[in-house]
Amino acid sequence: MDVNQLILLLKSKIKKNILIQNITIKDKTYLHKKHISHTEGKFHLELSIKSEELKKYNKIQATKRIYNILDEEIKQYIHSVQILIN
């Protein structure tokens, strides 16, 4: 799966499970290409989510919700993910 397909899939899954006002996903893989731990086909992503629903939870609870929704994709395609909740 290429990164653009992955981003569309992640947005779709999050929107189906959480009421959000806005979501932006950035590919930060280029920052890690020369690292020893870099694996081709595994991406470094930054998720910025504006959600009144997620703001009701503390940071750990909100992050767990996102991780649970994206569990399969994290295991297969994501090396690291940074989650920003606004």
Where are these regions (language model features)?
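N-terminal, polar/charged subdomain of small-to-medium soluble alpha/beta proteins
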Residues: 1-86
